[in-house]
A protein has these predicted regions:
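C-terminal/domain-terminus segments
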Residues: 230-268
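N-terminal leader/linker segments that initiate helical-solenoid repeat arrays
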Residues: 21-71, 75, 81-86, 90-99
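Bacterial N-terminal signal peptides
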Residues: 5-17
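Short coil/linker segments at helix-helix boundaries
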Residues: 36-39, 57-65, 89-129, 137-173, ...
Length: 283
């Protein structure tokens, strides 16, 4: 099955620096007087406080409640860039939290991911020069691809790549975008020649090329920029396993033991790293 890989980032990384990154890269409340007032017009809306509320709720893994605070901001200012990107992030999380045991889970997840894409594209329209709008376009499309038919996955592969590349071009220090691109390259490289021929014949569309070497390069860059993010080390180890570079994979998986648990899925990924290390320990 063709999976484009961006989903990995949005599933397991609660973006620690998204607030600061958005603040420094397009959040107008730092420079626009109407965002600096303590008693804003229109029923006393305090946008800065609403952002703080949303950030606190998100840190507590309450994505739904955080989204409600962000919607209050958009009801007053529909072009608030920071609220738009945070809403995209929140809807990705809401989709991820829907278990497969729920009737109609795929449709429910798809609705959340489409909402995430919608907010991300609105963010790009408001501030096309920010890395985060493009990044969340890629992230939302990656999640959509995971639960879509193969034809749709093939269609989205190039769009995901383009959004990631744009995100990186706008901020060469966006480690999350490098992470996503590293996983994307591995997923594309893992698709065999026959599968590519079938995709071309059956779906009338060629698949983008991927490279294990570039997967290593981009995931190493992600780790350099975010050295304590567990999932980047785990994904680089998976690339090394795919390349049968067992010593490099073992070294990375072992290093995860000492990393602090920072995000909601870190414990799960530490466990997976331990399982993988056990599997390849004698390779």
């Amino acid at each position: 099955m063709l999976v484009c890989g961006v989903r990995v980032l949005t599933l397991v990384v609660v973006f620690t620096s998204i607030t600061n990154a958005a603040d420094g890269d397009g959040a107008r409340h730092k420079t626009d007087p109407k965002f600096l007032c303590s008693q804003c017009p229109k029923e006393g809306v305090d946008v800065a406080q609403l952002h703080r509320n949303a950030d606190r709720l998100y840190r507590e893994f309450k994505a739904k409640e955080a989204a409600e605070e962000l919607l209050k901001i958009l009801s007053w200012d529909a072009e608030n860039f920071e609220a738009l990107v945070k809403l995209s992030r929140a809807h990705i999380d809401l989709g991820d939290m829907i278990p497969e045991s729920v009737p109609g889970w795929q449709e429910k997840r798809m609705n959340e991911y489409r909402s995430a894409e919608d907010y991300a594209r609105k963010a790009v329209a408001v501030n096309p020069g920010s890395t985060w709008g493009h990044f969340y376009v890629a992230a939302s499309l990656g999640n959509i691809a995971v639960i879509s038919p193969v034809a749709r996955q093939i269609e989205l592969a190039g769009a995901i790549r383009d959004a990631i590349e744009k995100s990186i071009s706008l901020d060469a220090r966006n480690g999350f975008a490098y992470h996503a691109y590293g996983v994307w390259h591995r997923k594309m490289a893992e698709i065999g020649k026959m599968s590519r021929i079938v995709a071309s014949v059956v779906y009338g569309r060629s698949l983008p090329a991927g490279s294990m070497e570039q997967s290593v390069e981009y995931l190493k860059k992600a780790i350099t920029l975010n050295p304590t993010v567990i999932v980047s080390r785990l994904e680089l180890a998976r690339t090394y396993i795919a390349m049968e570079d067992w010593p490099a994979a073992r070294s990375l998986l072992s290093s995860i033991r000492e990393l602090p648990v920072q995000f909601s899925d870190d414990a799960t990924h530490k466990q997976k790293a331990g399982e993988l290390l056990e599997e390849i320990n004698h390779r």
